[in-house]
């Protein structure tokens, strides 16, 4: 039997698998990206503060009965935080391409529904979730067609009136060709729907600056982050009634 040539989708999924395995095997040292590093802590606090502010702004603070999905959940760190925000474990679902990450997530919080799979083929029924979210997912995907398929799936499983929440890099990393900048224009094009409302804000001080400043002068790093001029990430919600 003649073997079919690999499609663009196959090649991109294979590249992502290789990239994530490299990261998890030591390409991203814990001492630099763990919360004991001041720059990482600044990033984490900024993300959480703006995430909660957005949910409050969009009247999404009563999470007890809401169904929540994270696409590209990794080991589930961010999804687990929603327990502190009032979400029930049985109403939270996470899916990730990497089986070993999901195994870790299940060991840390078995009450959440964790699935191994790709965001372009979500194993959920239409209109299943009140909140569908991703964190630093789309900037890792270099294939435009795969990004589009994942966006379509996120729309498909979102309930009418539900929110799509995205957090990602705004700019490409010149030192890392595996990262694509997700500008607001690119996000709008990717999730374009008639009547869709986009509410995005610029967050997270540029990592080179925060690494140089945060450990020496936390107040200065925090002030620079609040000024937003040197911020490199975006977070926001998309709503469609």
Segments predicted by a language model, with ranges:
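A short glycine-rich, Lys/Arg-flanked "PGG" loop and its adjoining helix->strand segment in the class I
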Residues: 148-160
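Acceptor-substrate binding/catalytic loop of class I
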Residues: 141, 171-189
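Conserved beta-strand signature within the Rossmann-like core of class I S-adenosyl-L-methionine
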Residues: 161-168
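Conserved alpha-helix/loop element of class I SAM-dependent methyltransferases that forms part
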Residues: 44-64, 81
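A C-terminal cap/extension of S-adenosyl-L-methionine-dependent methyltransferases
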Residues: 185, 189, 200-241
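A short acidic, Gly/Pro-enriched loop at the edge of an enzyme's catalytic core
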Residues: 120-132
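N-terminal, positively charged/glycine-rich alpha-helical extensions of SAM-dependent methyltransferases
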Residues: 1-34
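Class I SAM-dependent methyltransferase SAM/SAH-binding core
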Residues: 69, 75-121
